[in-house]
Amino acid sequence: MISNGPGDPSAMPYAVKTIQNIVSADEKMFGICLGSQILAQAQGMKTFKLHRGHRGQNHPVKNLVTGKSEITSQNHGFAIDPETNNGSVEITHVNLNDDTVEGIKVKGKPAFAVQYHPEASPGPHDSRYLFDEFVSSLA
């Protein structure tokens, strides 16, 4: 589990290197918020500072795998640049307000992450399935 946290993921090259090693070892991984940005950087993607951060409990996100929309809680000021995807990452979720990346999965690896906060309570519970998927992958 790569937890959330404050700040610019580019200031954490040590974390990016650690995640590269974990992904290379085929370890199972679930990233949340900052963890999503670090996983993206570990796959060669870049992040950027949002003009206006995503803050609050009513951000609509589309799951591109299922086609369903989810209401999410968010609190981040950086985003993943989809133009820097070298093909190693599948973009799984996008923000319906501004089309920013909200979820990724590393192709061929048991590693995925979301930019928002599925653990947030009180708040929307549309994304609780992510924890079920991660726990199931551990079995």
Q: Locations of the language-model features?
A:
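Conserved Rossmann-like nucleotide-binding pocket used by diverse enzymes
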Residues: 30, 92, 112
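Catalytic beta-strand/loop cores that center a nucleophilic Ser/Cys/Thr
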Residues: 67-109, 138
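Short, glycine-/Ser/Thr-/acidic-enriched flexible segments
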Residues: 7, 77, 118-119
